[in-house]
Amino acid sequence: VKKLTSHNIQSGLYISLQSTSTKVLENIKRKNLKINKIGDLNDLAKENSMPLLTDLILGMPGETPQSWIKNIENVFKNDITNMDVYYLQLLVNAPMNVDQKEEYTLETFGAYDYFYETNVETIQKEIEAGVAESIQVIKSSNTMNHDELLDASIFSWFVLGTHCLGLSHLLAHYLHNTNGIKYTDFYLGLMDYLKEHDSNFNTWIDEYGAKDIRILRTYFGNIDIRHH
C-alpha cells in the first residue's frame, strides 16, 4: 500500500468496515474485523504517513438508528476522518438478496442514477424504451423504517461535510479529548442548534429529504432517485 501511495496510485490504507455492529457483522457473515483492531491499523498507517480510509453501508440487516450512530462514533474515536457512506444495494443472486431479503424485510427501490454519465432526461427515455439500467437500493428494513433511514442518511452527510471534509473535527477532537464528549453527541447537538437558528440548514434538510414527494436525494446532486 505504501508503494502504491508513493506513486499516487492509491490514496491511503483502505479498510471497508461496512458496520461496527457485532450483530450486523454476524448477520452478513463478515465478523472478521474487530473494531479494536482499527486503532492498530491507524497507528500503522500513521507510522508510514498514510491516511486511513473506510466506508460504512447504511441499511444493513439488523442495523438500527442507534447502532448506526454508534458506527460513526467508533470510526471517529479511532481517529479516522476519511470516511464514505453508501446505501445498501441488493445485487441479483447475491445471498443477501436471495436468503435475507424476506428475513429482514429489506424493502428497496429501483435507482437509475447509480451509474456514470447519467441524467434525468436520459434515464426517463431509457425507462420508456425499456432499456434502463437500475439497481435495488435499500429503503427500509425491519429494524430501520424509511423515515429512520432518511434521518440516518441526513446525519451521515452532515458529519461527512462538517467532520470529514470541514474544520469542525478540530473542535470535536478537542472536546472529546479534554471533556470526554462523544463525537456523535457533539454533532447531534450541532444539528439541533442549526435547526433552531439557521433557516438555510432547514432548507437543506427539506430539499434532501423531500419526503412529501417521495424522492430521496443523494450525493449525485441534481439527479433524483425515484421510488418505483
Please name every model-derived segment.
Residues 1-181:
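A structural motif corresponding to the C-terminal lobe/cap of the Radical SAM core domain
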Residues 173, 177-228:
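Terminal or standalone catalytic/regulatory effector modules within metabolic enzymes
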